[in-house]
Amino acid sequence: MTHQVATCHKKQSFSGKPTLSRIALLVALQISASALPISITHAEEQADESITVYGQANEAYAAGKISKASSIGMLGDKDFLDTPFNAIGYTDKHIQDQHAQDISDVISASDPSVFTSGETGLNKESFKIRGFSSDIGDVMFNGLYGIAPYYRSSPEMYQRIDVLKGPASLLNGMPPNGSVGGSINLVTKRAQEAPITSFTGTYMSDSQFGGHIDIGRRFGENEQFGVRFNGVFRDGDASVDGQSRKAQLASLSLDWRNDIALIEADLYFSTERVDGPNRGLSIASGVDVPSPPSSDTLLSPSWAYNDSEDKGMMIRAELDLSNSVTAYGAVGASRTDFDSNVPQRVKIIDDSGTLEVSLGSVKLESKRTSGEVGIRSSFDTGPIEHYLVLNSTYFREDKNDSPTGNNNPGSWNPNIYNPVWGPEDSTYDNYYELPVDSTQISFGVADTLSLANGKYQVTLGLRHQSIDYESGVTWNGNAFPTTKLKESTYTPAIVALYKVSDSVSLYGNYTEGLTNGKTAGSGAANVGEAFEPQKTKQTEAGLKLDMNDFAHTFSLFEIKKPNGYQDPDTNIYSFGGEQRNRGIEWGFYGTVLEDYTLTGGIAYTDAEITKATDVTTEGKQATKLPDLQAKLALEWNLPVMRQLTLIGQANYMSEQYIDAQNTQSLSAQTIFDLGARYNSTIANQSVIWRLAVNNVTDEAYWTTTHYASLALGAPRTVMLSATADF
């Protein structure tokens, strides 16, 4: 078995000798560092396997949309049946076919375990995995936290987007923002063996036009040098009246390889400007959820804006020390500058839909460094094969958030059915400075023990995670005491897999995730007490079925996440609160009867508050989450016209509660999408035409949102693209 690097690229064998498993060069983790999963040959008996292709993508299901392998953190890439987790990898073909403009578009299209609101104009990507919020700032870039764009990431520079469901601190270390529902890894494009030059022109209603150029080449006597460039520009009006968006991206990927070493570098620069952004609405207690207005209504002033700029870079290296030992290391840095002027809080205050508005602005600057070093080795002890991994991760963020607010223009009195807003106002009553300096360091070890050529596999692992956190608050020039936290903890994992046959695997795991601890506030009897990183604990069992062109994953899970809790009797603050999510998932993807491709599934998640400061909410369902999601995407390649593929998709979400007492809720919805794809040849050049009409019935519906309780779902949106290969 060969474990691959997260980028799915293998070094080319030039001499005819067996290719050694790649290993990253040990990069000193001094001031900053950064990391990625790497590949190594699992056992020396495989040493005669010569790999002669570099940069070739893994085999894929669903007509090339779903990779048969995905990155599993420090364990490297694993094939579908060898992965003891519920994981999925989306290829660049899926990204293109989905007309995706961010990561949420990719991972939520047909996966029922992932929930996104569907609203437009939010300043950041927002999604939930297995019922828990996952912060876009916790997305990994080639295995490193903190390198990807901070608020939104254009997906055109990625070869693959991997999603691993459930907490995974052993595999990746503690996410900077404490996401525990799952982890996402963005794998950048590399130059392939064959040169690539393609241009994609895009249109999205009402009048947003754009282009994407993708160029890749290899150079040198043995094609040891690789260059891949991606450039993106989009600008124009969105499908919501009064809302527009402009996005730019330039990314460059470089690599060099020989028989035993690999060096890769990535650089990118991206910007986004949204005019008429939308943070959503809250609703006053006792007010019924009103009927939604027209689907293209902008519930925010058109003069409001979000403006962000991201830049990042990383270098990684791998070196084969022997046939069975690989060393790896990576280092990266990124910076985000964000500026916003938008209503911070908009509340529905009566049954007629009247809005109460508080304005505010935000300026944010975030600088991040990240890294990883490690060693992977394979060896045998009698009949047992070992795959041993040691690694250390590092992450630091220096952030300054400068919000303003509390300007309440009461004379406006907008209404959701007639949202008339006053002129732009930047005179605010309150000014804040919220600096944060956070450093996270971890050391992890994992040993995968295999018997009978991998039929029986058990992975035992442990990670030590430390965090050094300091934050401050300045309000209208008045400084408040600094909050300091310096704590550490251990997170174990036990994972097992049994390959029943060449097409069936059973797996189970116990894993933990970490969220930053806090200090007890001024209202607590134990004010100032610091708490270590808090552990979210998962137990999971599942079955995987590989029917060559069609795959299924069935899983059962329970996740318990601690929440802040202040004892009503003693007034002592702790993390004694708890949310418990229990769920069952069925996901499938593949080709059926040659002409049909199916992707989708069903997920039921019972998210219950089991202990809370307000005891009346115990036993209630967690808010802003449908307990049932069902998704199905069908593609039909017409037998009478093989160049044409017709596409249909349906997404169902059940009722969602938006208040802790479960008295206010949003009704269940089913959204339908239609599309088509046509392969043509023009002037001897391949041209692929893609058409999508999302929310084809133009359903007006409420959905939940990251910052507030509810927001309008996206209206009917038409997207068209044409990709020409030169």
UniProtKB/Swiss-Prot annotation:
The residue numbers the entry assigns to motif TonB C-terminal box are 709-726
What does UniProt give as the signal peptide span? 1-35
Q: What happens when the gene is disrupted?
A: Mutants are unable to grow under iron-limiting conditions in the presence of anguibactin.
Q: What induces it?
A: Induced by iron-limiting conditions.
Pfam assignment, any one: Plug
| Molecular function terms from GO | siderophore uptake transmembrane transporter activity; signaling receptor activity
Keyword Membrane among UniProt keywords: yes
> What membrane topology is given?
Multi-pass membrane protein
What keywords were assigned to this record? Cell outer membrane, Ion transport, Iron, Iron transport, Membrane, Plasmid, Receptor, Signal, TonB box, Transmembrane, Transmembrane beta strand, Transport
Q: What is this protein called?
A: Ferric-anguibactin receptor FatA
Per the UniProt record, the source organism is Vibrio anguillarum (strain ATCC 68554 / 775)
